[in-house]
Amino acid sequence: MTSVQNSPRLQQPQEQQQQQQQLSLKIKQLKLKRINELNNKLRKELSRERITASNACLTIINYTSNTKDYTLPELWGYPVAGSNHFIEGLKNAQKNSQMSNSNSVCCTLM
């Protein structure tokens, strides 16, 4: 009888040990999941196109030196009377979109 009485007591530590192992596995799975998510996030960030600060500055300088801004008449002069460069830019953009047959463009940025 003592062996029968001892068997439930032996089962409890075994069950507790199994529960501890299951809990340990769940924790390890969660850690692995978090590491994989972070790894994927870092891969996406690494695949993003990057330019150096000097190239970005050169692009800005090139744009500002080649694009006329009539809000600075001391630098660029005044626009020709009767001309509207906003409408001209819109017409050019529409012509370009018709030539390329691209209907995916919804807006024109100036």
From Swiss-Prot:
A lipid is attached at C106 (S-palmitoyl cysteine). A lipid is attached at C107 (S-farnesyl cysteine). GO terms for biological process: G protein-coupled receptor signaling pathway; pheromone-dependent signal transduction involved in conjugation with cellular fusion; regulation of pheromone-dependent signal transduction involved in conjugation with cellular fusion. Keywords: Lipoprotein, Membrane, Methylation, Palmitate, Pheromone response, Prenylation, Transducer. GO terms for cellular component: Cdc24p-Far1p-Gbetagamma complex; cell cortex; cell periphery; cytoplasm; G-protein beta/gamma-subunit complex; heterotrimeric G-protein complex; plasma membrane. The keyword Membrane applies. It is a lipid-anchor. It comes from the Eukaryota. Belongs to the G protein gamma family. G proteins are composed of 3 units, alpha, beta and gamma. The beta-gamma subunit complex (STE4-STE18 complex) interacts with PLP1 and PLP2. This is Guanine nucleotide-binding protein subunit gamma.
